[in-house]
Structure formats: structure tokens, C-alpha cells
Amino acid sequence: MSNYSGLNILKSNAKELAKKKGIKLTEALEAIAIDAAFSNYHELSSVAKRFPLEPRLMKAAFGETHFENVIFSSDVYVQFEMAVDELLSDAVASTNANGFAVYDLEPTEVQYDEEKGLLNMTVAFSYEGEQMPDHFFSGISFFLTANVPLIYRDNNWLIAEEGIEIISSDSNADPDSDWYDL
């Protein structure tokens, strides 16, 4: 079993709990299992080996019942929005719009690497602003697909160091203009 499997993450959490509360590791494992809605640690361990993506196990180990939900957790979503703001700042500066935000965020592909604790997610979304009054229309929306690498460290999901990569983009700008090419 790998370092970043759900079961190994829960074992690490149990070690920390045992140390923090001054209890035996077996007691900490039982407490974590019961807190995760399993009857005992043996049940949790058996389920983890047969069904590593079982929702109770996922929630206890990764904070979400499905990997697709990770992008919507508050910390990750804020990180994602900030990264998109930065990536698209030049393109946004060329529009006659402001107040851009992410809309219709949808994970389209999700893969978790238990060896590295790396969740590779492909997402589709729009990035939309509001037309500034008294300015010519030059586009207010970008339609994007991006790769979002996330790592799970210290019971938190973070955007990995390599950051978000935009893999496709389109805009509702004038098709004769080339300002929106990313």
C-alpha cells in the first residue's frame, strides 16, 4: 500500500492522535474508525483494501466523499480562483469588462496517484466579467479547460507547485480580433 492511500493517511492521523492524547495506537485507530462511521478499525481496514474509494473512507482520509468534490472545497476553490485571475490577467486587461469570476466549474477527468499523493484534475469552466458601460464590446467571457494538479499534505488539499495549466480556451470576443489568444 502506498504512502498516500486513504488507509495510510488514516494510520498517520491515528499516530498523531495517539501521541497528542497519550493513548495507545490501537485506541486511536478504533477512534478514527468509529468517527468515520465504521463499526471498528478492522471493518475500516477491510473496506479500504477492497473499496479504496468508499465514501466514508474518502471523507475520513481526504475530507471529501469523492475526488471530484475537492476542487469545490473552500480553500482549493479560493486558490483556484486566484491562480486563474493571475493566469488570465493579460487577456482580461484587453477586454472592456471587469469583475471577472469563475462560473460553471466542472471536473471532467480525475486521477489520483497514491504513490505521490497527487490528484490530477481536468476541469472545464467559464471566466466571465461584466461589460463596462460606455465601452465597445470586446468580449466578456472565456471558455476554458485546464489541468489542475492538487496535492494532499497535512490533511489539506493544495494546488501543486507546477500550478494550473490552461489546455484550451475560447472567447466570445470579436472573431476577427486576436487579442484573446492565450
Task: Give the residues covered by each predicted segment.
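Cystatin/cathelin-like cysteine-protease inhibitor module
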Residues: 50-182
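C-terminal alpha-helical interaction appendages
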Residues: 1-72
